[in-house]
Each structure stands twice: as structure tokens, then as C-alpha cells.
Regions:
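Active-site loop-to-helix junction immediately N-terminal to the catalytic Tyr of the SDR YXXXK motif
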Residues: 7, 57-65
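Residue(s) in the substrate-gating loop at a strand-loop-helix junction
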Residues: 51
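Hydrophobic alpha-helical topogenic segments used for membrane insertion/localization
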Residues: 215-239
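A short helix-coil junction within the Rossmann-fold of NAD(P)-dependent oxidoreductases
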Residues: 33-42
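SDR active-site lid
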Residues: 84-178
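Substrate-binding pocket helix/loop in short-chain dehydrogenase/reductase
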Residues: 7-8, 12-17
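Active-site helix of classical SDR
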Residues: 31, 67
Length: 240
């Protein structure tokens, strides 16, 4: 994926085009390639990696947010077409929170201070477990971490209030106190050399587990438990 941390007024048309080509069209082209193999076999699951930003855009990442919105729209269209065709191929989206990945070390940035994942952040293994689970189940969407749930609820109930909140907090929450090096290399136009691994530089603050994810993946069991409790209460009231 590609992104740019920058105010809109400082972005160039070329940068928007590049982020769109890599982050959005990369998903489109990959999906088309997968469908060529999967449709004749009439089975399989395509897992699209989304973000909490699918539901709520934030300042300083306009190109990336727009690309993630586009991925969601593209995925919804595919899903409807597969249902119409009675295909057994499934499409799911895994909505990620902020993850401790090397993104923040190589992303192009015009910020005064180094970029950081918006707290609370999670280790990449949390996201990997969600993707693996989604590939083996038929869930339409999987939300990883409270930030994804918060974005959905907040933008549905009070989008205007969220605008003002992010206008006041969204700049500082995406930056550390450490000054950015304006001459450091980035991966917008070409990959950087070397293996950056899967983890970023925010090991101490990244969570290794997501209780929200556990609740989401186990919601059928939770529902069964609630139903069992309700049935027990009803029986007790009848006996009383």
C-alpha cells in the first residue's frame, strides 16, 4: 500500500493518483486475477484488507482514506454480483485498527514530527489472525479492535461532532514528539531497499490481543449464551 501524511492543501495531483493506483487499483487488479481462478472452481474466499478509515476519514491521510472508501464500494459491488450469479465464491472485508507495522518508517510525510499509529494500536499478528479466520469462514465483515467499532458507531450517530473532535485531536494524535527528517527516503514512488520486517517501532504501546476481535469472532457463541440465559430466566419465571 501507499500513503502520504500531508494536509490536502499541500498535496499534488500526482500524489493522489499514485496512492489511488497502488492502494485502490492494486486491490482491484488483485481481485480480478483471483476471480479468474476462483469463479471456474466456484469456491473460495477473497479477503479484502480494509480499515477503520473505511467508515470514518481522518485528517492528514485524505488520499489513503479515499482509497479505502473505494475498496469498500468495490467490494460491495462484487458481493452483490456474486449473490446474483449464485456463486459460491465469497468476499469479506477485515477492517483493521492502527497496527504497529513499518508503514510509519517509510511513508511519505510532510508532518513536522514523526508519524505514529493512532492509539490504541495493535501488533500485526492480531490483524493476521483476523485475516486467517476470515478466509476460513463466511462472515461478511470482521472488525479488528475497538477503533473500528468506534468509527462505525461514531460516524453513524454523530458525524458532525466527530468532525469537530478530529479537527481538534486528529493532528496531534498521529504524531510523536520526535522531529521528522524531511530528507528520509519513502516508498511512494518505488519500494525501499532492505527487509523492514512486519513490526514497526512502537512495540511498547502495541497490544498483542484484541478482546473486541474475540467477541466478534465468537458472537455466535455469545448469542447462544444470551439465548440460553433468557430461556433460563423465562423458565424460572414460569415455575415461580
Amino acid at each position: 500500500m501507499a500513503s502520504v501524511f500531508s494536509p490536502v492543501k499541500e498535496m499534488s495531483p500526482e500524489e493522489y493518483k499514485r496512492v489511488t493506483e497502488v492502494t485502490y487499483l492494486g486491490v482491484v487488479y488483485g481481485t480480478l486475477a483471483a476471480l479468474k481462478r476462483m469463479l471456474p472452481r466456484n469456491r473460495g474466499t477473497i479477503v479484502q484488507v480494509g480499515s477503520a478509515l473505511v467508515y470514518r476519514s481522518i485528517p492528514l491521510q485524505s488520499a489513503y482514506c479515499a482509497a479505502k472508501h473505494a475498496i469498500a464500494g468495490f467490494t460491495d459491488s462484487i458481493r452483490c454480483e456474486l449473490i446474483h450469479d449464485k456463486s459460491r465464491v465469497r468476499v469479506t472485508m477485515v477492517q483493521m485498527p492502527a497496527l504497529n507495522t513499518p508503514l510509519f518508517s517509510w511513508v511519505k510525510s510532510r508532518l513536522k514530527h514523526k508519524a505514529q499509529p493512532v492509539p490504541p494500536s495493535f501488533q500485526p499478528e492480531v490483524g493476521a489472525r483476523a485475516i486467517y479466520w476470515a478466509a476460513h469462514h463466511t462472515r461478511r465483515e470482521v472488525n479488528v479492535g475497538w477503533p473500528s467499532v468506534e468509527a462505525i458507531i461514531g460516524n453513524k450517530l454523530a458525524p458532525g461532532l466527530l468532525d469537530r473532535y478530529l479537527g481538534k485531536t486528529g493532528f496531534a494524535s498521529q504524531q510523536t514528539c520526535e522531529p521528522e527528517n524531511p530528507s528520509r527516503p519513502d516508498n511512494l514512488w518505488q519500494p525501499l531497499k532492505g527487509d523492514y520486517g512486519a513490526h514497526g517501532t512502537f512495540e511498547q504501546r502495541a497490544r498483542e490481543r484484541s478482546w473486541e476481535l474475540r467477541a466478534s469472532l465468537g458472537r455466535s457463541w455469545i448469542g447462544a449464551g444470551v439465548a440460553a440465559i433468557a430461556a433460563a430466566v423465562w423458565l424460572a419465571s414460569r415455575r415461580g
